[in-house]
A protein has these predicted regions:
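A surface/extracellular/periplasmic glyco- and lipid-processing/surface-interacting theme
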Residues: 2-222
């Protein structure tokens, strides 16, 4: 099965994915002297199960513009993993999931608009809007004012649960303008579920720990 597009690795990606112990397919990485941004070095020091740029496992789809046109195959990835002896399933603690609220118990908060940092002079081309549909109890995404269509299914991208996770941001002050995102610790979170808005906090105690989400009363979000 086709998977992608494949992009380069960043330190905060490694911190988010570590709790899942996955096969990590990527092309390129940040190579720095700063351990807070050195994705290339940390991929090795963390012993990430990596599938990098070498080999015939990737191709360009011929439709999308670079660098969004690079894809791979799940079957090829699993074959590579078998050859490396990565054939065991990780032990993953699941988040909690509830049933959909009944129509009568769904809210009316129908729009979520997320604006990118003001330094991006692109007239909102990457701003994200999620529109809630009470019938399907789902949030449908637009990017830059246009519906975001999944290239493989030709349907609009949607989700049942939307989380805005706020993290500390700081520049790395290097020649590439890299940034540092604090993903370990805790911070504010806002949840959009069942057409309603709930606030609380996220918590991640270590790189390999799963991020957990709570409401303001300390209950885990479902």
């Amino acid at each position: 099965k086709k998977v992608g597009p494949i992009r380069s690795a960043r330190q905060y990606y490694l911190e988010w994915l570590s709790s899942f112990d996955p096969l990590f397919i990527y092309d390129g990485c940040a190579d720095t002297d700063n351990p807070k941004t050195d994705a290339c070095g940390n991929i090795y020091s963390y012993k990430i199960k990596k599938i990098a740029t070498a080999g015939a496992w990737r191709w360009n789809d011929g439709v999308r513009y670079a660098p969004h046109n690079e894809y791979s195959s799940l079957f090829t990835a699993w074959e590579y993993a078998d050859d490396k002896g990565w054939d065991s399933m990780p032990n993953i603690e699941s988040w909690k999931f509830k049933k959909d609220a009944t129509v009568d118990n769904r809210g009316q908060k129908t729009k979520v608009k997320i604006f990118f940092h003001e330094r991006l002079k692109n007239n909102g081309a990457y701003d994200s809007t999620w529109t809630y549909d009470i019938k399907t109890n789902s949030y449908y995404e637009e990017i830059g004012g246009k519906k975001l269509i999944d290239q493989e299914t030709n349907t609009q991208v949607y989700t049942k649960n939307l989380i805005i996770q706020e993290v500390e941001y700081s520049p790395a002050y290097d020649d590439k303008g890299r940034i540092i995102l604090t993903t370990i610790g805790e911070g504010k979170a806002t949840y959009f579920i069942d057409g309603k808005i709930t606030t609380g906090k996220w918590k991640k105690t270590s790189r390999t720990d799963r991020t957990t989400y709570y409401d303001n009363s300390g209950n885990e979000i479902q």
